């Protein structure tokens, strides 16, 4: 196994992060991700003098990143600071090697109050479960397609198919559990 290192993100690694995105996303998505990423890492007014991202290095190469936003919880009137994990990405060649467990262990060692995780896909859900994270009873993530015609146009790249799906799904509530 390679010697992976998990460190807080700094601007010097942006080129490596961009390469990681380019491996997995289309050019337009990379541009949008970079704008959002720069806001999270440079312009976010809620930053607490620490990076909201960790990067995973294999030598000098960025092979992963993990985002977490600072949050404040209130329990019975008492405030607690913590983080909400909201972005995780590993290079395709780095998956299935136990790196996710290394990352979660290192983040826990480097930050206090790492407390929640959002916006899971199935692999992330399995990883966090294996690492002892618990599902929150009664918390049911949902998604709703606000403008179905626009969504189908973007996804299908065909006005005809978009209209067809709109007719087929007319009357269907697009709020579905994930």
What are these regions (language model features)?
Residues 78-92:
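Conserved acetyl-CoA binding element of GNAT-fold acetyltransferases
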Residues 126-128:
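Conserved active-site tyrosine of GNAT-family acetyltransferases
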Residues 73, 134-158:
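Conserved catalytic-core motifs of GNAT/GCN5-like acyltransferases
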Residues 1-57, 62, 84, 154-178:
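Short amphipathic alpha-helix that is part of the acyltransferase structural core
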Residues 110-121, 133-134, 139:
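Conserved GNAT acetyl-CoA-binding A-motif
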Residues 65:
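Short glycine-/small-residue motifs
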Residues 90, 95-109:
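Conserved acetyl-CoA-binding loop-helix of GNAT-fold acetyltransferases
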